From Swiss-Prot:
It is found in: Cytoplasm. It comes from Streptococcus uberis (strain ATCC BAA-854 / 0140J). It is an enzyme of class 2 (transferase). GO terms for biological process: nucleobase-containing small molecule interconversion; pyrimidine nucleotide metabolic process. Belongs to the cytidylate kinase family. Type 1 subfamily. ATP binds at G10, P11, A12, S13, S14, G15, K16, S17, T18. Pfam families: Cytidylate_kin. This is Cytidylate kinase.
């Protein structure tokens, strides 16, 4: 039975990470949150007041403080920059609102994509992000592109923020998500788009379990055929 690679792409708050984690657990696969890696680079930039002109400094920080993922006692994923636990810090609004310009820097994408490919080379992995199926794993056995309405995605982000104790305004979240959609889909480097061979699935009004079932059935069919 072959260990496959699953790529899940889509815009902000389309449900990628939530379903990817569940499917990875169900299949016994490794889950890699590539978005967290770009958030780490953004956190570095904001913490040090770096701009687009400080690319080498950001890369140096990433080299000196490598990104690693660990499991908490409750099974949740922790994100570290060197020895610093940045799991919550990289989910703050200032990071969310700045990650687009950092992730648009070609040199940073090249470095993080190289790391992601090294991790995925043995298969049995599920990755979610913006360009997994188009750039990071163009030969992935299963590619999914999730979409959802701006209203639904803002509602999801609002609930997530409440659970994490982050103050947010629903209308502001809608504006921020729409703005990020535009930035992500219009950037010169690795713009947000579905791979030609990706399965596009609209999650608006669909439960998390419904999305998980849809993707997992596709994955299991490919695994059984391998």
């Amino acid at each position: 039975m072959k260990a496959i690679r699953i790529a899940i792409d889509g815009p902000a708050s389309s449900g990628k990470s939530t379903v990817a984690k569940i499917i990875a657990k169900n299949l016994g696969y490794t889950y890699l949150d590539t978005g967290a890696m770009y958030r780490c680079a953004t956190y570095i930039a904001l913490k040090n007041n770096y701009s687009e002109n400080d690319i080498s400094a950001i890369l140096k920080e990433l080299s000196e403080h490598p990104i690693t993922f660990k499991k908490a006692d409750d099974g949740s994923q922790l994100v570290f920059l060197g020895t610093e636990d940045v799991t919550l810090a990289i989910r703050q609004n200032d990071v969310t609102n700045n990650v687009s310009w950092v992730s648009a820097i070609a040199e940073i994408r090249e470095e993080l994509v190289a790391q992601q490919r090294r991790i995925a080379q043995d298969g049995a992995i599920i990755m979610d992000g913006r360009d997994i199926g188009t750039v990071v794993l163009p030969d992935a056995e299963l590619k999914i592109f999730l979409i959802a309405s701006v209203d639904e995605r803002a509602e999801r982000r609002y609930r997530e923020n409440l659970e994490k104790g982050i103050d947010s305004d629903f209308e502001t979240l809608k504006e921020e998500i729409a703005a990020r959609d535009f930035k992500d889909s219009h950037r010169e480097v690795s713009p947000l788009k579905a791979a030609d061979d990706a399965i596009v699935f609209d999650t608006t009004g669909v439960t998390i379990q419904g999305v998980v079932q849809f993707i997992q059935e596709k994955a299991e069919k490919i695994i059984d055929m391998s």
